[in-house]
Amino acid sequence: MEELIVELRLFLELLDHEYLTSTVREKKAVITNILLRIQSSKGFEIKEHVQKPEVANSLPAPPQMPLPEIPQQWLPPDNGPPPLPTSSLPEGYYEEAVPVSPGKAPEYITSNYDSDAMSSSYESYDEEEEDGKGKKMRHQWPSEEASMDLVKDAKICAFLLRKKRFGQWTKLLCVIKENKLLCYKSSKDQQPQMELLLNDCSITYIPKDSKKKKHELKISHQGADALVLAVQSKEQAEQWLKVIKDVCSNCTGTVDSDGPLSSSPVHKTELEKKLSSERPSSDGEGAVENGITTVCNGKEQVKRKKSSKTEAKGTVTKVTGKKITKIIGLGKKKPSTDEQTSSAEEDVPTCGYLNVLSNNRWRERWCRVKDNKLIFHKDRTDLKTHIVSIPLRGCEVIPGLDSKHPLTFRLLRNGQEVAVLEASSSEDMGRWIGMLLAETGSSTDPGALHYDYIDVEMTASVIQAAKQTFCFMNRRVISTNPYRGSTANGYACPSGMALHYDDVPCINGSFKGKKPPATANGITGKVRTLNSQPKKPESVSCVKRTASNAEQYKYGKNRVEAVAKRLQSKEEELLKRKEALRNRLAQLRKERKDLRAAIEVNAGRKTQVILEDKLKKLEEECKTKEAERVNLELELTEVKESLKKALAGGITLGLAIEPKSGTSSPQSPIFKHRTLENSPISSCDTSDTECSIPVNSAAALKRPPSSNNSPCRGHVLRKAKEWEMKNGT
């Protein structure tokens, strides 16, 4: 027993020179307490000194130096508390002593902060007061984190609380290495949960001003949510501020100061603008009043100083007023100068959301055109910073990417792809294409581009929106005042290209009167060019689309024309097949009728069986042909609908394809206008009548067909009659 006690004492002495975890230290303290009680009860203290040389001789490797003195913590409790360690202590770690009863050694409750069991309310911070009257700071004992790889080469590390999205708090191990802030969920993790670059950032210290608040450090990055960390005391906050200032000494940061002692009045103005325009952060917002702000470039550190009671009262009033102003400003946000647009920009906005292809991923970005540049922003509310800016001069606009993204268009410079953009609708795509064509300085007609992945109807919508935006943007470049200029209504055609806006032919071929009448959209039917001269009257003549001169007003839409021609040829082929089927069915029905009559005549004879077999085969063939005829009718109806859409879009596209009489679209706009030309109304000479006004293409397409000329009634009655005749036979 004596040898065991001596060996145990030596083992405990060796453990004194080793690094122990909190669990091992607790066990060591328990064993030491038991050993002291055994020694005091059996009186082994004297015997140990007598037998110590003998035991030492029995050891295989006796120590060459005398054993160290017994530490104070092994002595009875009457000798005093255990000594304090001299090693450096990490932040956020302490051991709390529990009151001891007589005859017992002190026990320690170790807090290693490695679990999420800690409450998000963080009440221990709320109970602290800065004055510290009658209180002593808790001593921080060393922890196992001090020798981990996580904190190696770290400038500072501590367990801090991070403010979450809905005001809750979560505990993280925060470490600053080089120029990064690494946040670990636990000291056992090898990968950080969050990594934040301290370049170009601003850090703000917000002291605790009530029991519901904490000492907070707010780290802000442009274009990202602020990171809010809670520290235990003002001293700890100053340490972190100093370290971050040293880390960012070679970087440029933004100033987020609200103090009256700021070195430049511009900083205060910028902060007030930011407070009035920024949205509430997901990590929570804290006011900067009575705070300390450190600029990341290390050149400036603004501190608020307490002054007299009068100044304190004025500060409180100022803080209250700012809070009220901020609450009111959340509902009514005054747009910044970047967000404000002129009245001309409101008509055709030069900004909007687009999907941008970046690193094989589609991301939604707020895009706007300004000063011949396409600027990408992360969000609509963040216009002070941009992700990338692309100069548009010299670029080429090409619609289409693949069939999965039909509303895509690309920007090319010298054959190299600069940007791939996707719109949300055909109108939006046309607006952006027209806008980019105008800003790039291109003389390409929006209708001359090839739209390979969208159908005819959508192509018409894209081209119409592109041409309107194209003319509008060029009109803004030519005339600073949209209501004053040499062109009609401020519209002009770029690079000497004639603008084909009204594609519907003018009735009777000319206008009567000195002034050309305006269309429904306020755009004159007379088309001018930038370099229009009196010597060339054909450049300013009105657009007249008839069968003779339709070829010269084509928009280069070879693909759309090919589709329409293909549909027409397919319709003709289906009509021929339908006619052949109809003749064959009529022949089969006649043969069937004759066979039935022959069976009635030859009833009871041997030939009746042969005739019945022929009748069965004939019935089967009739059913097959009838099913084929029904499928043919369905296919023909579908082709007619497609052809009708193609011919309706031909007005906007300027196609030289005309509907055939008696085919799918007898009520197409071209057919209607030809009817009007042959009607008595076309011979009227008054300039104020509706027949002499050129019709806008969009209005003509949106106009519902007249109920008097409905082509469906006779067709339905004819089909019903055919089915009745078939069922009757």
From Swiss-Prot:
Region (Disordered): 56-91, 112-139, 257-291, 701-729
Molecular function terms from GO: actin binding; SH2 domain binding; SH3 domain binding
Residue stretches of biased makeup (Pro residues): 60-69
Any one GO CC term of the record: actin filament
SH3-binding, short sequence motif: residues: 71-74
Annotated keywords: Actin-binding, Coiled coil, Cytoplasm, Cytoskeleton, Phosphoprotein, Repeat, SH3-binding
PH domain residues: 153-249, 347-441
Claim: Electron transport is one of the keywords in the record: no
Cell compartment(s), UniProt: Cytoplasm, Cytoskeleton, Stress fiber
Summary of the tissues where the protein is detected: Isoform 2 is specifically expressed in brain.
Motif (SH2-binding 2): 451-456
Impact after mutating Y453A: Reduces phosphorylation and abolishes interaction with activated SRC
Keyword Oxidoreductase carried by entry: no
Post-translational modification (record): Phosphorylated on tyrosine residues by SRC.
Motif (SH2-binding 1): 94-97
Residues in coiled coil: 557-648
Biased composition (Low complexity): 113-123
Biased composition (Basic and acidic residues): 267-282, 719-729
InterPro entries linked: AFAP (IPR030113), PH-like_dom_sf (IPR011993), PH_domain (IPR001849)
Chain residue ranges for the region called Interaction with F-actin: 594-637
Swiss-Prot/TrEMBL GO biological process terms: peptidyl-arginine phosphorylation; peptidyl-tyrosine phosphorylation; regulation of signal transduction
Its job: Functions as an adapter molecule that links other proteins to the actin cytoskeleton. May function in facilitating interactions between SRC and actin filaments. May modulate changes in actin filament integrity and induce lamellipodia formation. Can cross-link actin filaments into both network and bundle structures.
Record PANTHER family: ACTIN FILAMENT-ASSOCIATED PROTEIN 1, ACTIN FILAMENT-ASSOCIATED PROTEIN 1 FAMILY MEMBER
Protein name as it appears in the record: Actin filament-associated protein 1
Organism of provenance: Gallus gallus
Gene this protein is translated from: AFAP1
